[in-house]
Amino acid sequence: MRLTPELLVECYRRGLFPMAGPGGRVGLYRSDPRAVLELDALHVSKSLARVLRKGVYEVRIDQDFEAVIRACADREETWISEEIIRAFLGLHRRGLAHSVEAYDGEGRLAGGLYGVALGGAFFGESMFSRRPDASKVCLVRLVERLRERGYVLLDCQVQSPHLERMGAVEIPEAEFMRRLSEALRLDRAFA
């Protein structure tokens, strides 16, 4: 299987997401239960609220998508292969994959996240942080943007302690697929 932007779109519409295993071989996966972040249930800790109020980071959208996806892939164990990066860069060029980036006071990329926007759904793929709270700031700004633009679903795929602290919950796959179907009928613009 060769991962293309077109295949990625079809996968997301069917509730699948790509991951590369050892050696970079890409597979398509589902998660049951599925982690989602309800847009009205984001948990912002007091310390994160202070960081947001102080404006420690400048947040930008789609300023350097490739730097974000490569930073997300830059770990000892990663599921983001070169093939996945190429396919997502193609999606980004088509206006379907987006990044939210946090820059420090020196203008350096301090953290970010990326994902795919289809209809009224946003599929969060990965995030990274080089400085304290940078990826969390990006997640807060992402949720604000999705709310403002009328999105109804933020897919986090697989629950993690970090996402759980931010308010992500797990739902049965059948419920996720029902909600995904409803979200895909909407016409929303991320950019």
Curated annotation (Swiss-Prot):
Q: State the source organism's domain of life.
A: Bacteria
Q: Where does this protein reside within or beyond the cell?
A: Cytoplasm
Q: Which Pfam families match?
A: Leu_Phe_trans
Please list the GO terms describing molecular function. Answer: leucyl-tRNA--protein transferase activity
- Top-level class of the enzyme under EC nomenclature: transferase
Which reaction(s) does its UniProt entry say it catalyses?
N-terminal L-lysyl-[protein] + L-leucyl-tRNA(Leu) = N-terminal L-leucyl-L-lysyl-[protein] + tRNA(Leu) + H(+); N-terminal L-arginyl-[protein] + L-leucyl-tRNA(Leu) = N-terminal L-leucyl-L-arginyl-[protein] + tRNA(Leu) + H(+); L-phenylalanyl-tRNA(Phe) + an N-terminal L-alpha-aminoacyl-[protein] = an N-terminal L-phenylalanyl-L-alpha-aminoacyl-[protein] + tRNA(Phe)
Per the record, what is one GO cellular component?
cytoplasm
- What EC number(s) does its UniProt record assign? 2.3.2.6
Keyword field contains Cytoplasm: yes
Is Acyltransferase one of the keywords? Answer: yes
Q: What does this protein do?
A: Functions in the N-end rule pathway of protein degradation where it conjugates Leu, Phe and, less efficiently, Met from aminoacyl-tRNAs to the N-termini of proteins containing an N-terminal arginine or lysine.
Q: Which PANTHER family match?
A: LEUCYL/PHENYLALANYL-TRNA--PROTEIN TRANSFERASE (PTHR30098), LEUCYL_PHENYLALANYL-TRNA--PROTEIN TRANSFERASE (PTHR30098:SF2)
Q: Family, per the entry?
A: Belongs to the L/F-transferase family.
By what name is this protein known?
A: Leucyl/phenylalanyl-tRNA--protein transferase
Q: Which organism is this protein's natural source? A: Rubrobacter xylanophilus (strain DSM 9941 / JCM 11954 / NBRC 16129 / PRD-1)
